[in-house]
């Protein structure tokens, strides 16, 4: 009954997010200098470049059908959001729910964030999330053959062609394969992993070493008759990106985002602490939290090279949450319900109030210098009604 009730409300929640996503994507479509659109306009017409794969597909489609490039981008963005929400619902629908799981799933660091901060909506990390769920589904099958590792390799390669930021989140992908293999590092497994990552590493090499010239960027821009935002940042080197962060950094920003991290991750951290690996080796039972921290560490580099700290927290939380529930669904870990001694926390009404405050009372902003937002769902619905009437 709890699972059925959860699925009903969770589906309603996802439908609401989908409708809000469509509304705000339509607004972004009409904005001639919208950063997200500029990211999708990047293509290979000036030569190979990072983030150009999906833009090249869109460019080629625009030459075949009578829709404009912006219209095709809009359709791709809406389709990506819908497909992501569909995958999310199916990912969680068979899990036996409890209150702490619900708190973790409805954390403001997760699904509501891209809608709360519309400049993040349909950014290219959505392909990272879709790729991760697809790979998690593949490695949820009872037996994994060479063809499944081929799918793994192909999905990762396509994903890095779309968004190179995936490199900092590779540990999450390796995590689910390692735990699927019960941390058995035999020769066959190692060979499969190495072969699977070769195409990914080759693409990464070209992304790092191939740079468009100023004329190449002009050629690319001319192909779509637009040139702004992410398109003009393609030639930025790592040093200049770091300089943008360090020039605006203040210790208060770090403190704020550390608090956002701790509060937003609270439910998930509790869940991990009350879970253990199902293994004959008792020493491994204490390593679960350590493994999650290990997977998280490489992504910390993102906070040094780009100001979008809210996005990085959203990505880390999303992948951490999906990784945990992948392990739970496949019986790689077991969760032991914590015994709540505080009578107030066992009161249903108190839990509902805490749930509303924690899950719908706040959200992180996008840039490191931005303050914390409040009442994200209410504000977005109010904005829609206000602009419609």
Q: What is the meaning of each model-derived region?
A:
Residues 113-124, 269-328:
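Membrane-water interface signatures at transmembrane helix termini and the short loops
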Residues 148-175, 300:
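Membrane-interface alpha helices of multi-pass inner-membrane proteins
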Residues 19-29, 191-272:
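Membrane-lumen/periplasm interface segments of specific transmembrane helices
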Residues 75-98, 134-138, 272-274:
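Transmembrane-helix motifs of polytopic, lipid-linked glycan transferases
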Residues 52, 102-130:
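Aromatic- and kink-enriched transmembrane "portal" helix at the membrane-lumen/periplasm boundary
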Residues 147-150, 193-198, 333-362:
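Signature aromatic-anchored transmembrane alpha helix within multi-pass, membrane-resident enzymes
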Residues 170-197:
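Perimembrane helix-loop-helix junctions
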Residues 127-144, 148-156, 173:
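Specific aromatic-rich, kink-prone transmembrane helix
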């Amino acid at each position: 009954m709890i699972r059925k009730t959860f699925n009903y409300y969770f589906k309603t929640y996802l439908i609401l997010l989908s409708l809000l996503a469509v509304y705000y994507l339509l607004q972004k479509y009409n904005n001639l200098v919208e950063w997200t659109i500029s990211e999708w306009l990047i293509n290979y017409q000036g030569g190979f470049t990072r983030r150009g794969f999906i833009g090249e597909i869109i460019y080629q489609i625009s030459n075949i059908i009578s829709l404009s490039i912006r219209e095709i981008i809009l359709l791709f963005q809406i389709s990506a959001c819908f497909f992501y929400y569909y995958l999310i619902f199916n990912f969680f629908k068979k899990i036996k729910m409890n209150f702490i799981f619900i708190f973790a799933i409805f954390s403001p660091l997760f699904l509501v964030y891209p809608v709360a901060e519309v400049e993040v909506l349909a950014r290219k990390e959505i392909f990272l999330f879709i790729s991760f769920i697809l790979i998690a589904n593949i490695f949820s099958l009872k037996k994994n053959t060479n063809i499944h590792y081929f799918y793994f390799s192909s999905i990762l390669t396509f994903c890095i062609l779309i968004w190179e930021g995936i490199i900092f989140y590779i540990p999450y992908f390796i995590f689910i394969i390692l735990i699927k293999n019960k941390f058995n590092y035999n020769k066959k497994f190692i060979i499969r992993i190495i072969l699977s990552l070769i195409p990914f590493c080759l693409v990464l090499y070209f992304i790092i070493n191939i740079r468009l010239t100023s004329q190449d960027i002009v050629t690319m821009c001319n192909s779509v008759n637009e040139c702004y935002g992410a398109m003009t940042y393609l030639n930025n080197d790592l040093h200049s990106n770091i300089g943008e962060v360090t020039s605006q950094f203040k210790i208060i920003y770090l403190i704020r985002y550390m608090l956002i991290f701790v509060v937003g991750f609270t439910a998930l951290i509790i869940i991990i602490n009350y879970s253990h690996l199902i293994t004959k080796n008792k020493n491994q039972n204490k390593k679960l939290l350590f493994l999650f921290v290990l997977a998280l560490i490489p992504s910390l580099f993102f906070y040094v090279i780009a100001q979008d700290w809210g996005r990085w927290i959203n990505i880390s939380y999303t992948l951490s949450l999906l990784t945990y529930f992948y392990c739970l669904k496949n019986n790689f870990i077991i969760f032991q319900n914590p015994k709540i001694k505080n009578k107030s926390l066992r009161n249903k009404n108190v839990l509902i109030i805490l749930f509303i405050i924690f899950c719908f009372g706040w959200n992180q902003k996008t840039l490191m210098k931005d303050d914390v937002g409040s009442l994200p769902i209410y504000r977005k619905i109010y904005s829609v009604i206000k602009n419609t009437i």
